[in-house]
Amino acid sequence: MNINTNKTKEMLLGSIAGNPPSPLSVAGQEVERVTEFKLLGVTITDDLKWEKNTAIICSKAAKRLHFLILLKRSGVASQDLLLYYKTVIRPVMEYACLTWQSSITNGQIDDIDAIQRRALKIINSNSNNQSISVTPLKERRQHQANHFFKLMLSDSNCLHNVLPAVRDKQLTNRLRNPYQRPVPFARTERYKRSFIVNALANYQ
């Protein structure tokens, strides 16, 4: 395997960031150490928080609201405006949401929800028809998380082995769900809000 050091970054996560080791080098060339990095369209920071990624999401979605306004001024029907929102704006706010949906703060949730409220206000303004409403974004994210987690429960799923082993059926045969999986003990709030721990807690 050949590593292109010009395209390779090093990021220190967790407690190691407080006592950083010597810089990583490959073939005598030092790898750049960064505090944030965009991976497959998701901005990850060394504190494992989502302020930067949320800000980018909201900024990108807000820019697309401008075209929604232009379509509204051109007399496009409300149902077509809603279709534009669902296909052009909302996907931006839900991209890779499984990585962050259980970890973002209430303030970040409000920032994302504000974009949807603005879009619906534009769509419904000066409309003679009944106001159009959509499923709350938080509810949609949770639905996606539940669906993905259920896929992971299948033995054939490539992520199945990431989950804790099923509890002994004999010990749980009186429970509503006889195949409960233990929820890992979370010492930190960050780990408690991670996808798998959060999904397991909701599944029990």
Report each predicted region and the residues it spans.
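C-terminal accessory extensions/subdomains outside the catalytic/core fold
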Residues: H160-N161, R167-A186, R190
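Short, conserved catalytic/metal-binding micro-motifs enriched in Asp/Glu and His
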Residues: L39-D47, A61, I89, M93-Q101, ...
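Alpha-helical interaction elements in eukaryotic regulators
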Residues: W50, I57, R64, Y85, ...
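Short, charged alpha-helical motifs in flexible N/C-terminal segments and linkers
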Residues: M1-T5, K9-L12, Q108-L171, F195
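Short, conserved micro-motifs composed of acidic
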Residues: N2-T35
